[in-house]
């Protein structure tokens, strides 16, 4: 069950990251503080997406807490790297994100996935 909570946490955190990225690219920069605050107070689509991203992170932390009760930290922590993979793929697939494909990034994703497979492979107990 810990693995399932961990996967929920990763998926929710990835969606939250994409939401925050969308909001950050559409809201005024925080260097223009009054414009930023005015946009938040207007509670338009961008501000609502920012709020959803923040709430998503909060929900992800709850799932992560449940994960740590059921799964060893060494395995649970490795799951977090899947978020990089999901956000990278989503940025290339979703319209308007303009994510770029590169062999270097693909190699990095392959390394992450290989590492996860090594960590989560079932171990066989040797009999002597």
Curated annotation (Swiss-Prot):
GO terms for molecular function: carbohydrate derivative transmembrane transporter activity. GO terms for cellular component: plasma membrane. SUPFAM superfamilies: Multidrug resistance efflux transporter EmrE (SSF103481). It comes from Escherichia coli O139:H28 (strain E24377A / ETEC). Pathway: Bacterial outer membrane biogenesis; lipopolysaccharide biosynthesis. The lineage of its organism: Bacteria, Pseudomonadati, Pseudomonadota, Gammaproteobacteria, Enterobacterales. Belongs to the ArnF family. It is found in: Cell inner membrane. Heterodimer of ArnE and ArnF. Keywords: Cell inner membrane, Cell membrane, Lipid A biosynthesis, Lipid biosynthesis, Lipid metabolism, Lipopolysaccharide biosynthesis, Membrane, Transmembrane, Transmembrane helix, Transport. It comes from the Bacteria. This is Probable 4-amino-4-deoxy-L-arabinose-phosphoundecaprenol flippase subunit ArnF.
């Amino acid at each position: 069950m810990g693995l399932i909570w961990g996967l929920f946490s990763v998926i929710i955190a990835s969606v939250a990251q994409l939401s925050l990225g969308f909001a950050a690219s559409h809201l005024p920069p925080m260097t223009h503080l009054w414009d930023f605050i005015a946009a938040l107070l207007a509670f338009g689509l961008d501000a609502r997406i920012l709020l959803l991203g923040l709430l998503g992170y909060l929900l992800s932390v709850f799932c992560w807490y449940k994960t740590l009760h059921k799964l060893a930290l060494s395995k649970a922590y490795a799951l977090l790297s899947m978020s990089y993979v999901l956000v990278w793929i989503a940025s290339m697939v979703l319209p308007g994100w303009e994510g770029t494909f590169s062999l270097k990034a693909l190699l990095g994703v392959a390394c992450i996935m290989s590492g996860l497979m090594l960590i989560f492979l079932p171990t066989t107990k040797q009999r002597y």
